Amino acid sequence: MSHIDAEIGKLGHNAYIATKVSFTEEMEQISREHSADPHHVMSVIHADRRVKSKEHLRPGLGPYGGKCVPKDTRELINASHTTTLLSAVESVNENAKDSRLIIGTKSAVRQPAENRSL
């Protein structure tokens, strides 16, 4: 591992912790806006094994998708005026989609027609 890898990893580690703390704070605000108990809400979130899994933290997975994750994220954004973190998450995901489309388009264009598959 290079010193640059280690330094970015250390900075990323602290930013990840900050993101988790900020997410919890945002969920507390949303919970209180809707008269929910934030401790119960966080218990529901932590009950899902995927929250503890490292599987979704691998580089190269691309943007999130599926049926429930985008829909439920948008629902929480719409449910509160204080969801700046979740709005940023949605924005990052949209940028990742756009980036993947551009990269995919460029690589397809660079290939000779006879080497491209549909």
Features from the language model and the residues they span:
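Structural/interface elements that position substrates and couple domains in central-metabolism enzymes
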Residues: 1-118
